[in-house]
């Protein structure tokens, strides 16, 4: 956390043994902590999240820095966006995984057993290969997993992903 020097209020809590944040490395607040921003743009914080979400909704592709590196993201219901992502990645047929907002969203498209539900919602947040419902809402485009009866699904595991997905239905 060297890159984020603490403000006086956070430093006070960090060095006071009587507080719950005593000697906790990630102590920070909106004044001194990390922030969400876009490279090459002025938006910060919530505005950056809204701009990114709008870009995805309009068929754009964005790179999102997460815990384990970068991942490319587009709207999995937009056939043209997914095809463009396939071209960029030079990945003509290998299935893509999708990130769903929540378990309810997954269940609209896929069959989910109790065991799969536990795995999907567990703390590890793996990509789980699930059977597509024959009578599902079919909002995912075919290009996600061409000719495949299964789709790789995961739930958000990083704060930035949760923020992006929480704004899906917010009127902008």
Residues of each region from the PLM?
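Residue-level detector of conserved catalytic or cofactor/ligand-binding positions
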Residues: 165-172
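A short, well-structured juxtamembrane/interface segment
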Residues: 45-56
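Glycine/threonine-rich flexible loop motifs
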Residues: 18, 71-75, 154
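Glycine-rich N-terminal segment of FAD-binding domains in flavoprotein oxidoreductases
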Residues: 56-58, 62-70, 74
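Gly-rich Lys/Arg/Thr-decorated short loops/hinges at beta-loop-alpha junctions or inter-strand turns
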Residues: 31-38, 65, 140-148
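A phosphate-binding glycine/aspartate-rich beta-alpha loop in the early core of alpha/beta enzymes
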Residues: 69-139, 143, 148
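Structural motif
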Residues: 35-37, 60-63, 95-98, 126-127, ...
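Cys/His-rich short segments
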Residues: 1-45
């Amino acid at each position: 956390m060297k890159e984020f020097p603490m403000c006086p209020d956070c430093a006070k809590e960090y060095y006071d043994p009587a507080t719950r944040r005593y000697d906790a490395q990630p102590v920070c607040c909106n004044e001194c902590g990390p922030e969400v921003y876009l490279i090459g743009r002025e938006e910060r914080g919530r505005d950056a999240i809204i701009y990114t979400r709008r870009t995805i909704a309009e068929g754009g592709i964005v790179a999102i820095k997460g815990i384990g590196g970068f991942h490319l993201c587009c709207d999995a219901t937009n056939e043209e966006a997914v095809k463009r992502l396939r071209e960029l990645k030079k990945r003509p047929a290998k299935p893509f995984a999708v990130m769903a907002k929540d378990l309810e969203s997954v269940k609209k498209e896929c069959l989910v057993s109790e065991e799969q539900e536990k795995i999907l919602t567990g703390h590890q947040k793996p990509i789980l290969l699930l059977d597509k419902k024959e009578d599902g809402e079919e909002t995912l485009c075919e290009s996600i997993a061409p000719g495949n009866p299964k789709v790789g699904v995961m739930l958000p595991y990083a704060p930035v992903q949760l923020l992006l997905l929480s704004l899906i239905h917010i009127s902008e």
